Amino acid sequence: MTSCVAKEPIKKIAIFGGTHGNELTGVFLVTHWLRNGTEVHRAGLDVKPFITNPRAVEKCTRYIDCDLNRVFDLENLSKEMSEDLPYEVRRAQEINHLFGPKNSDDAYDLVFDLHNTTSNMGCTLILEDSRNDFLIQMFHYIKTCMAPLPCSVYLIEHPSLKYATTRSIAKYPVGIEVGPQPHGVLRADILDQMRKMIKHALDFIQHFNEGKEFPPCSIDVYKIMEKVDYPRNESGDMAAVIHPNLQDQDWKPLHPGDPVFVSLDGKVIPLGGDCTVYPVFVNEAAYYEKKEAFAKTTKLTLSAKSIRSTLH
């Protein structure tokens, strides 16, 4: 007989938009839900839409002083509050106070953080913990509901790459990334896809809270291996761009020897190594400053045990 994991019901949920102020789908949806929350209301749930970086939203820029989605580590969250701190660090402390504290029993049960990418990644769910039965079950439910539209899962669990995301203050952090969409732009198709992902996620939580038992399941995920920079010259300037064969090919297998970059003089730089990888965030506009042309991932399968709420 398969064991069933009993988990506490979900009570407090936040939906974050505007963590990056120029990623407009989340901004648009959260602003709408703040005016009229009927769509995200579920019986027995406290669902709070929230604009995380209002100053960046006002200026339609990714951030004011630094990336809000990278400062939710305990060092930044524990710094003494001061006007000298970067705006986003001060804002992180405010958000941690409202929805955390991080790693505490009082923290919100679940945070959805809504993002857009200029990369051709379609609907993407971002997972931070490969052993989380509840989120694997939720992602399986969302993927099934979104079919036949693909919904990929990006696993950012890595021993040396620490993200310190805004959503990491919650017990269950969920990143939702939908593209391609230029920053500072709204596209109806992307808006519709993100809206449906949130609907299905909230439906799953409601079913779970009402006592539905979810049988064992498994999902394919793409786990981060490393980030790849653009080729650079002696001055540190970019010396090549993403090759046309790689452009828009997120989630597709990339084999050793396949073209990855091409320089202005036509030199093609292939993928090295000896294993097939799956590229994501290919040519993401916001990652030029981070010196990231794309991320290599490996494809694997995660399994979750059967789950049900402890109330039933």
Swiss-Prot record:
Site (described: Transition state stabilizer): R62
Binding site for N-acetyl-L-aspartate: R62, N69, R70, Y163, R167, Y287
Cellular component terms per the entry's GO annotation: cytosol; nucleus
Co-factor: note: Binds 1 zinc ion per subunit.
Main location class: cytoplasm
Record EC number: 3.5.1.15
Domain of life where this protein originates: Eukaryota
GO MF term set: aminoacylase activity; aspartoacylase activity; hydrolase activity, acting on ester bonds; identical protein binding; metal ion binding
Keywords recorded for this protein, A-Z: Cytoplasm, Hydrolase, Metal-binding, Nucleus, Zinc
Top-tier EC class: hydrolase
Active site per database record: E177
Subunit structure: Homodimer.
PANTHER family (alphabetical): ASPARTOACYLASE
NCBIfam families in UniProt: PRK02259.1 (NF002601)
Protein name per UniProt: Aspartoacylase
Provenance organism: Mus musculus (Mouse)
